[in-house]
Design a protein with these regions (language model features):
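A short glycine-/small-residue-rich loop at the edge of a beta-strand within enzyme catalytic domains
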Residues: 118, 140, 182, 186, ...
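ATP-dependent adenylation/nucleotidyltransferase module used to activate substrates
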Residues: 2-154, 158-161, 166, 189-197
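Short, solvent-exposed coil/turn elements at secondary-structure transition points
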Residues: 75-77, 103-105, 171, 185, ...
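Catalytic subdomain that performs nucleotidyl-dependent activation
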Residues: 68-69, 147-228
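The feature marks non-catalytic terminal segments
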Residues: 200-263
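A structural signal for well-ordered alpha-helical scaffolds and beta->alpha junctions
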Residues: 16, 20, 83, 124, ...
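Short, basic, helix/turn surface patches
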Residues: 122-134, 168-174, 227-246
Length: 263
């Protein structure tokens, strides 16, 4: 059996409960895909987006809904080794990627205040724009369960507000475009287990400023949240699930003030 088929099989069989069912539940629970959609799956080269690409291929192949996929990779200024690693992994996993270039790393190079935040915002715009050029109406990103709960805690502790990462949202700058996060219910631990099971190696941090194709060493507020959640989990093993559910069970009668943003 070819390696990419073994990788596909592992998602459906070995990790059916941990990954596949949660992936399908996320799509269904949050109504992410409709018939006739043309979705650009955005690949950064990391484990999350590469798993997302395979899951999207599988649901297109075996699902009952008719929709189209494109697999896009934005090169913001990767070093040659990082770029080649993405290409090699895409070939191993039988993912037909389209690569386009941008100069984001050059733009944010001299910015000291929140360069990662600015880089992420700029990436989003480039991805939307390229997806539109491919006649797509949605982009799919690889954010997972842990990203969601980390974002929720970060908003409370560093921004003084309650805000979570949404499973889908309409773009305010690109008319007719929507962002979806199909791995919304999948836990990072299970993604890492899937990577180890298949003996795969993905980029951990492709930022030029680390210049390391295997290890992303940059600390961040998100890393602080990971450590905090890990400690809290020692007290209660369901703490992460409770944080996640808190955004689904907000009682406005117990909230002093709230705002509504109209997209």
């Amino acid at each position: 059996m070819e390696r990419y088929k073994e990788i596909e099989r592992s998602i459906i069989k070995r990790f059916r409960k941990e990954i596949w069912r949660k992936f399908i539940s996320g799509i269904n629970d949050y109504d992410m895909i409709q018939p006739g959609d043309r979705i650009a799956v955005c690949i950064s080269g990391g484990k999350d987006s590469m798993l997302l690409a395979k899951c999207m291929q599988e649901v297109q192949r075996h699902g009952k809904m008719d929709f189209e996929l494109e697999f896009i990779v934005m090169d913001p200024g990767y070093n040659p080794a990082n770029r080649q690693k993405i290409i090699n992994n895409a070939e191993i996993m039988n993912i037909p990627i389209k690569i386009f270039d941008s100069d984001i790393f050059d733009i944010v190079h001299d910015i000291e205040d929140s360069p990662c935040y600015l880089c992420a915002r700029m990436r989003r715009g480039y991805l939307y724009r390229y997806a539109q050029q491919l006649n797509c109406n949605k982009i799919a990103l690889g954010h997972h369960f842990d990203d969601v709960i980390e974002t929720t805690l970060m908003s409370m502790m560093y921004m003084g507000q309650f805000q979570t990462m949404m499973p889908k949202l309409h773009s305010t700058n690109f008319e007719g475009m929507e962002l979806i996060r199909p791995l919304y219910l999948v836990k990072e631990y299970d993604i890492k287990s899937w990577v180890r099971y298949n003996n795969l190696e993905f980029l951990q941090c492709a930022c030029r400023f680390t210049e390391d194709t295997d290890k992303g060493t940059q600390d961040s507020k998100r890393q602080e949240m990971k450590r905090l959640i890990s400690k809290l989990r020692e007290v209660s093993p369901v703490i992460d699930t409770n944080i996640f559910q808190s955004a689904h069970n907000v009682n406005l009668n117990t909230v002093i003030a709230h705002t509504v943003q109209v997209n």
